[in-house]
């Protein structure tokens, strides 16, 4: 945006980290005829392959604009740096991110077990102790812990889906593999929005129950729901473990193929020089 009217904009790029001289090149320019234009937008596709950007290099992109003032100097945007990675490195990055999700899911399982233990302790209280205000607060705190775990798991499911959207850009990953992963991430989100929320509500209701029998009923329901949650988390862990093994095999095979291509290229180069 320029209050003096935009005269033109340009998009430029610089290839870095290649061991050669860095030269900024203009990718595209847009001229603006009207002096009244205060805001201008431009779209230009970028292809690392067409730019000759090898794996490990960086493409630095920035825009510039000039207005209609006499002798106006161009104004530059901030530089956006795009790191170029090979499909093998990208596949390994996706695999590592999903492996991190499994590690965090194990922590969710541990904390869910703690919630179940707290629920069992609340159930085991004698009526006099259960009627105390401190016990009611404890039930509400446990409900809040359950709610927090639900939010964490839901966030992890969304993160996993974003990883899969990135994986769709990589030809290494087969459509069926991505579909199976998507189903697992969706199950994770459904668990966070369903039974985990349900358990939190049951615990909260137990904290505000007007009678001992109502409290016991809510706690019993919460216990059953929490046990079901743990079973589903364990099932998710098994699915993710199995799919990580498949991803490991896929990325390893891709790396071996790349090594073979490199060896073949070196062999051809040596043969030409002999």
Kindly label every feature range from the protein language model:
Residues 1-274:
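Extracytoplasmic/secretory ectodomains and luminal regions
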């Amino acid at each position: 945006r320029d209050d003096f009217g935009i005269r033109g904009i340009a998009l430029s790029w610089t290839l870095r980290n290649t061991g050669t001289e860095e030269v900024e090149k203009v990718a595209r320019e847009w001229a603006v005829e009207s002096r009244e234009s205060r805001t201008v937008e431009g779209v230009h596709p970028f292809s690392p392959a067409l730019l000759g950007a090898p794996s490990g290099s960086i493409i630095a992109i920035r825009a510039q604009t000039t207005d209609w003032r006499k002798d106006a100097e161009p104004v530059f945007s901030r530089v956006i740096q795009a790191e170029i990675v090979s499909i093998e490195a990208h596949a390994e990055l996706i695999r590592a991110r999903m492996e991190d999700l499994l590690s965090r899911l194990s922590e969710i399982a541990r904390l869910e077990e703690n919630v179940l233990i707290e629920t069992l302790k609340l159930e085991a209280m004698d009526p006099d102790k259960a009627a105390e205000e401190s016990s009611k607060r404890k039930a509400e705190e446990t409900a809040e812990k359950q709610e927090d775990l639900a939010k964490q798991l839901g966030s992890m499911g969304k993160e996993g889906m974003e990883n899969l959207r990135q994986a769709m850009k990589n030809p290494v990953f087969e459509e069926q593999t991505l579909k199976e992963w998507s189903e697992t991430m969706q199950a994770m989100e459904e668990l966070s929005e369903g039974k985990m929320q349900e358990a939190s509500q049951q615990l909260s209701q137990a904290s505000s129950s007007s009678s001992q029998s109502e409290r016991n009923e809510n706690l019993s329901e919460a216990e059953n729901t929490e046990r079901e949650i743990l079973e589903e988390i364990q099932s998710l862990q098994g699915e993710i473990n199995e799919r990580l093994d498949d991803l490991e095999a896929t990325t390893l095979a891709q790396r071996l193929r790349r090594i073979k291509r490199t060896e073949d290229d070196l062999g051809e180069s040596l043969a030409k020089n002999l």
